[in-house]
């Protein structure tokens, strides 16, 4: 993976031959690639071809994704990047760091050492935060299951070698119906059905035909139209009194 400084541009290439590229219309631009399928020099050349100019100097950053098997051992508590690295997007690490700290402060931290560092609180912390990262892995893996097969990297992804049991089961459900929200992680901080719905629809796992069938409630068009109207009205009622983004930020 490497990052480069770039001028503002209205063009972007979100997915390249060996993984993905950050948006070009940002001040910082980069290309995340898998060195099992492309060399750093090849990735460098592809990035330059995509953005249309030479990139010098360039900074290469190597990483391995994964998490600690045990996040809390005795008096050592791993938080944030010490606990896991999922992907080179700051929002993911910020989110998981906040969730870990929130769990520790509200569910574990006591007035004494024994209240805080007992076997029960430690085991609960390790179980729930390990689950948080594992479900994050499922969510990220699903982003790549888009059926692309034009390079060796995408052929490898399409073979299912990097998929997970959860992603495979959700894709099987999507062939026949819209997955119910209860199928998705319900732990605080985990990606739930709203976020999964965008990924499944965007990658083609959930088709418009299946979604329309679900909305129609067994081909009852009247019920489907009523449900659609209800959701639109509900959205309008919630949003009409909200400030726009600029006003909200100014008043923070």
PLM regions: where:
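Flavin-dependent oxidoreductases
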Residues: 1-11
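Intrinsically disordered, low-complexity boundary segments flanking structured domains
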Residues: 2-3, 15-18, 182-186
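Conserved FAD/dinucleotide-binding core of flavoprotein oxidoreductases
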Residues: 10-64, 82-95
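A conserved active-site cap/scaffold subdomain adjacent to cofactor or substrate pockets
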Residues: 51-127
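Short, flexible loop/turn motifs enriched in small residues
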Residues: 9-12, 70-72
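Long, low-complexity C-terminal extensions of enzymes
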Residues: 106-252
């Amino acid at each position: 993976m490497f990052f480069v400084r770039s001028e503002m541009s209205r063009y972007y290439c979100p997915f390249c031959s060996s993984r993905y590229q950050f948006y070009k219309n940002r001040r910082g631009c980069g290309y995340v690639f898998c060195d099992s399928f492309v060399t750093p020099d090849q990735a460098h050349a592809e990035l330059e071809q995509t953005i249309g100019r030479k990139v010098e100097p360039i900074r290469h950053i190597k990483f391995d994704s994964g998490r600690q098997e045990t996040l809390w051992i005795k008096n050592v508590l791993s938080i944030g990047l010490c606990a896991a690295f999922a992907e080179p997007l700051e929002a993911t690490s910020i989110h998981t760091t906040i969730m870990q700290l929130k769990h520790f402060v509200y569910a574990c931290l006591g007035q004494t050492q024994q209240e805080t560092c007992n076997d029960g609180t430690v085991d609960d912390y390790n179980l729930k935060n390990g689950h948080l990262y594992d479900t994050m892995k499922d969510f990220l893996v699903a982003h790549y299951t888009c059926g692309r097969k034009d390079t060796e990297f995408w052929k490898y992804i399409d073979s299912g070698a990097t998929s997970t049991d959860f992603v495979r089961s959700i894709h099987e459900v999507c062939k026949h119906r819209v997955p119910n929200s209860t199928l998705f992680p319900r732990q605080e901080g985990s990606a739930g059905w709203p976020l999964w719905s965008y990924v499944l629809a965007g990658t083609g796992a959930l088709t418009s035909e299946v979604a329309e069938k679900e909305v129609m409630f067994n081909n009852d068009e009247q019920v489907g139209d009523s449900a659609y109207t209800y959701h639109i009205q509900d959205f309008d009622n919630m949003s009409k009194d909200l400030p726009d983004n600029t006003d909200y930020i100014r008043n923070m």
